[in-house]
């Protein structure tokens, strides 16, 4: 609905905008900041609110004052809740698993989106400094690796080896979740690039912390080789030719989920190093997604049942979100040059919230 097309696939733009506004209004109105007892300020709600808020932001000129107010309440409440929550870690400094079998990288990285969205939308808010410090802390923590604890490096003025209380990613950039090296969770590195792009869209310099270990984690999908044995046959990289996904330690959410990776590929095509071949993988996964969709006449992607994708809370919706993110990310590949903020933020808390 943000394009200039007046008619697409038989649906007029005005109708799409009207439906989008209804969704934005309905979701934001039911947030706890607007409706006592409503949803929000809990697990994954930072991701839900950012998805809604970005849609509102893209259509801001079409929202009335009341709609803008409830969106603002939602965004600011989620950013403040995230700042209070602070970073969490999979392992402590000694390597002991604090949350056995489950990295916190997904939760920490999607939490990052809330303060980033708030910064982008409300540049004069009294909580702006706290949102920025919170976002920097979450970005550093999200995909921190064991080797970071011994390296001499400073990110936004923060001595990582000295200050980091734990780690979330494996040394090779992969992520452990559900007790296995899990590509479905490694792809959450897109949240760092998504947050960075939100700031770019607001013409705000992006803290260097937003890119911390991101390229390394993407290589866990596109470059890292898994030998078989000990990993499952046939071995190789997670990203296989023709858009297929190899799961080195088994399946969590389904055997055919190419759309899950289109979003991260879209951002990687903008931000990762050329040798990751992100553009080629983006095209392969998008083609495979389209091939799945062409099996049906109703626009859906997945077959009924749980074999291809078992996510019961909206597998089609999640696929569409990833495709939309890839499209949006692509618009920034040759967009305005990004400004990176290398300033020091010595009061960032890596061990607790605000």
Regions found by a protein language model. Give the residues of each.
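Terminal, non-catalytic domain-edge segments
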Residues: 1, 121, 129-142, 177, ...
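Aromatic-lined, polymer-binding surfaces characteristic
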Residues: 1-214, 223-228, 240, 244-259
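Long, compositionally biased, intrinsically disordered segments
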Residues: 13-33, 78, 230, 234-245, ...
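Histidine-centered metal-binding segments
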Residues: 218
